[in-house]
Amino acid sequence: MKFGYFCNTTNWKHKPYHELLDETREITEYCDQSKWDSIWYTEHHFNHEGMESLTNPLMMGVDAAARTKDIRIGQACNVITFHNPIRMAEDIALLDQLSKGRVEIGIGRGIYGREAINLNKEADMKDQAKNFRLFEETLTILKKAWKEKFFNHKGEFYTYPAPNYVWQHDMSPPNKDLVNLETNVMENIS
C-alpha cells in the first residue's frame, strides 16, 4: 500500500498568501521527511472565499522538487481544458526532469464554471459534451508530445503546427523532420 497526501491548500482565515505557501512548504517537507509516497497539489482559480487557494500545481511542484529528495510530486489535478496543451506538456516534462523523475500526473476537465469561462471559453462547463471533446483532444496532444519525437495534430480545437507556417529562422536551418524542405512549410513540431 502507498500513502499520498492530498494538499488541498485552503485559506479560510484569509492570511497573506506567502504565509499560506510557507505552510504548504512545511507540509511538503514534513511528508518527504516522514516518507510519505507522494504529495498532491490542486488547481483552482478565483476562490475569494478561501477554498482551494493554489492556482498552479506545477509551480508548487517545482518548489517541492527543490526542497525534497524522495517524495513523488502529483497534481490533483491539472485542469488541462484551461491550458494550451503544448505548454502543459512542456511544463509537466520539465517538472519531471527537475524532480529527477518524481512526477505523478493528475488531469481533469474542471468543475467550476467561473474558472472555465474565464480561462478558456471553449471549456465552458455549460456545454459538457464540448468540454469533454476538448479534454479528449488535449489529452491526445499531451500523449503525442510525450511519446513522439516529432508530431502533428489537426483537431476540432487545436492544429499543430500552425497551418502554412513557413520556416524562417536564420539561427536554425530547416530540419527534414519538421519542415517540408521544398516549401519550407512546417509540417511537424517537436
Feature map (PLM): residue ranges:
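Active-site mouth loops of central-metabolism enzymes
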Residues: T9-L21, N78-I86, S190
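Short Asp/Glu-rich motifs
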Residues: K15, G50-M51, N84-P85, R114-I117
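Internal, glycine-rich beta/alpha segment that forms the wall or movable "lid"
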Residues: R87-S190
